[in-house]
């Protein structure tokens, strides 16, 4: 839980800006945030909201971000913040099907421009 001024907020309820701020300040780690979000996803798996989710890759990226942050090497405004991408944005090495049988086995070799920009800002 995190203090947001007038009440306690569950970590998974934090917005992107607040999450990024807390990571920059050191009051929240990328791993803590990623674990909270992954726990929430698992708790509601019956929704089947995720076409593809690589938990190990998310946690490894969060650990890398935390290590960089400790060295003062934050990457950008979204450093260490996990983001979800709709299954229509090409992401290199990750199945991107657009929920279509036509693209059932599509694994792009490069990222969409929006994904490139998110990664450049430090998003996981």
Across the structure, where does each feature detected by a protein language model lie?
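An N-terminal boundary/leader segment
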Residues: 1-60
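Short, well-ordered beta-strand elements within core beta-sheets of diverse protein domains
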Residues: 19-25, 84, 103-107
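Cytochrome P450 core scaffold surrounding the K-helix E-X-X-R motif
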Residues: 44-48, 91-101
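Flexible, acidic active-site loops/lids enriched in D/E/S/T/G that coordinate Mg2+ and/or position polar
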Residues: 55-78, 85, 104-109, 118
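Conserved small-residue hinge/capping positions at short loops/turns
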Residues: 75-97
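A glycine-rich phosphate/pyrophosphate-binding beta-strand-loop-alpha-helix module
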Residues: 113-124
């Amino acid at each position: 839980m995190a203090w947001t001024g007038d009440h306690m907020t569950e970590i998974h309820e934090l917005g992107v800006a607040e999450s990024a701020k807390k990571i920059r300040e050191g009051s929240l780690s990328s791993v803590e945030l990623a674990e909270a979000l992954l726990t929430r996803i698992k708790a509601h798996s019956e929704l089947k909201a995720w076409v593809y989710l690589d938990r190990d890759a998310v946690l490894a990226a969060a650990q890398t971000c935390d290590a960089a942050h400790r060295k003062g090497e934050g990457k950008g405004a979204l450093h260490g913040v996990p983001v979800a991408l709709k299954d229509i944005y090409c992401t290199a090495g990750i199945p991107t099907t657009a929920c279509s049988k036509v693209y059932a086995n599509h694994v792009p070799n490069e990222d969409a421009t929006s994904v490139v920009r998110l990664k450049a800002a430090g998003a996981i």
